[in-house]
């Protein structure tokens, strides 16, 4: 009884309750995952390691530039600046009443701090924002609640004026650095190929973090993937292992 009460309470917090749900434990775990909020600095680091430094992604970076007319480095720099600006804005403005335009950011604000062409900045802002007219038109044509969620997730800036933008949701804004960026790559013509390449790049990224952890640890040793068994039926081990005196952690990304 108490478990069901907790489930319904958490569901109400999320503004959604599935009456058909029978497994309250899996629903609880789902809510925890959906509520997870990564640090945006970690997202930026992850984006740089995968989308910029991993050369297997280079060919998709060219497609990204062709489709969006923006280099991925420019996109990451602009988005990070926007997040940083809004994050520090409350300390500068204070908690009292203020004009909504004080919370806004413009392409000129970004240009004053970053060495990026103003046309590129405007293109990025248009990619991640929506105007009032666009908002109304989309809601009229897409009554599905799920589609509304995805629309705001990918466009978390609201254009309150011709060149003034404010964030709709802080978490969605931070997700522009990695989660939304990945979906932008998936919209390229070679989605299936990108998904496979991204999976390998993400695996290398995760294993590099684990390897680095073990390198600086005095109690742990890292061992990577290896092949075993006779030819021609050789098999591959899991992706990695963390070895210590207490046991072994097997990693499969």
Language-model segments: which ranges?
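Interfaces and regulatory segments of ATP-dependent nucleotide/adenylate/phosphodiester-chemistry enzymes
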Residues: 2-213
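Active-site-proximal structural scaffolding
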Residues: 198-199, 203, 233-234, 244
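Active-site beta-strand-loop-beta-strand hairpin of nuclease catalytic cores
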Residues: 242-253
């Amino acid at each position: 009884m108490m478990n069901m009460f907790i489930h319904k309470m958490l569901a109400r917090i999320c503004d959604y309750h599935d009456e058909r749900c029978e497994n309250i434990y899996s629903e609880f775990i789902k809510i925890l995952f959906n509520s997870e909020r990564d640090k945006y600095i970690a997202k930026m680091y992850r984006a740089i390691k995968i989308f910029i430094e991993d050369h297997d992604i280079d060919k998709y970076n060219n497609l990204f530039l062709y489709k969006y007319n923006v280099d991925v480095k420019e996109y990451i720099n602009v988005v990070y600046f926007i997040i940083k600006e809004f994050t520090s804005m409350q300390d500068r403005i204070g908690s009292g009443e203020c004009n909504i335009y004080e919370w806004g950011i413009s392409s000129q604000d970004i240009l004053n701090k970053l060495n990026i062409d103003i046309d590129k900045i405007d293109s990025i802002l248009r990619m991640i924002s929506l105007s009032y007219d666009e908002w109304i038109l989309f809601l009229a044509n897409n009554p599905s609640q799920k589609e509304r969620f995805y629309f705001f997730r990918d466009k978390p800036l609201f254009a309150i004026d011709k060149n003034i933008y404010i964030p709709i949701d802080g978490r969605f804004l931070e997700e522009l650095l990695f989660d939304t960026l990945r979906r932008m790559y998936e919209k390229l013509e070679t989605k299936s190929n990108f998904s496979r390449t991204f999976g390998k790049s993400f695996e290398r990224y995760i294993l590099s973090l684990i390897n680095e952890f073990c390198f600086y640890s005095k109690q742990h040793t890292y061992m990577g993937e290896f092949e075993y068994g006779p030819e021609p039926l050789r098999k591959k081990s899991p992706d990695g292992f963390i070895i210590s005196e207490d046991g072994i952690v097997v990693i499969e990304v």
